[in-house]
Amino acid sequence: MHVITTQVLFIFCFLLLIHSIETLAYATRLSGARVGFIASALSLFNVMVIVSRMSNMVQQPFTGHLIDDAGKNALAIVGEQFRFLIFGSTVGTILGIILLPSFVALFSRAIIHLAGGGGSVFQVFRKGFSKQGFKNALSYLRLPSISYVKGFHMRLIPKRLFVINMLITSIYTIGVLSALYAGLLAPERSTTAVMASGLINGIATMLLAIFVDPKVSVLADDVAKGKRSYIYLKWTSVTMVTSRVAGTLLAQLMFIPGAYYIAWLTKWF
């Protein structure tokens, strides 16, 4: 059986899109602080997170079907396929970073429309997906330039936040994949292992909400109120997205050990 199949490529593109959306979600806070509408920016951020989470749930049955089709030598084949999918997460995150400056400008307009349209997300999407909306969006597209790193200092990088977000991203990236692989390692407890994926992703989401999001949100508020410089929020956001790349790379190392840990953990349920 071939490792790279049409279905694997489909899931690869799906994960690429999911991680691009999650990376670009960080642009909403930058945009909100830029135009002074933090609450509206948070609303747009929540929409993007919900879309990415829902998309992640949609791809899970397709990923699970890879195991059903693996046949003989499933551990080796599925292991290679899942590593390729994790690579898709890395590519998607890098794509999100490349598009970040463009989407900061794009989301700034979207947030203004959201605030001016009475908080109607539907109206924002209707304008955004119109013919004129596409033309306007294309005018904002630009590749990152060397000027984007102007004013950079190492002291602007919140190192603890980088490590925390990297670990959380790695857990979230392999949550479903390690759980499915654990089902192959312990076939007699495969259902228990697969169901554990929801718990793992739930814990990762909770850690993100407790340790990462509040710090970035408070910083965005301070910038909007003029208490701190915009450059601090900019480099905190850059820290977050680069730590996401590091997290997806760390996920390659954690994938198999994570699967064995889940397989062992299922003994206690």
From Swiss-Prot:
Disruption phenotype: Mutants lacking both murJ and amj have a lethal defect in cell wall synthesis.
Description of what induces expression: Transcribed under partial control of SigM ECF sigma factor. Expression is up-regulated in the absence of MurJ.
InterPro entries reported in the protein's UniProt record: Amj (IPR021260)
Pfam families: Amj
Record's bilayer topology term: Multi-pass membrane protein
Transmembrane segment boundaries: 1-21, 31-51, 84-104, 105-125, 161-181, 192-212, 245-265
MF (Gene Ontology): lipid-linked peptidoglycan transporter activity
Domain of life: Bacteria
Location relative to the cell: Cell membrane
GO biological process, alphabetically ordered: cell wall organization; peptidoglycan biosynthetic process; regulation of cell shape
Keywords carried by this UniProt record: Cell membrane, Cell shape, Cell wall biogenesis/degradation, Membrane, Peptidoglycan synthesis, Transmembrane, Transmembrane helix, Transport
Record has NAD as a keyword: no
Family, per entry: Belongs to the Amj family.
Function: Involved in peptidoglycan biosynthesis. Transports lipid-linked peptidoglycan precursors from the inner to the outer leaflet of the cytoplasmic membrane. May serve as a defense mechanism against naturally occurring MurJ antagonists.
Official protein name in the record: Lipid II flippase Amj
Organism of this sequence: Bacillus subtilis (strain 168)
Gene: amj
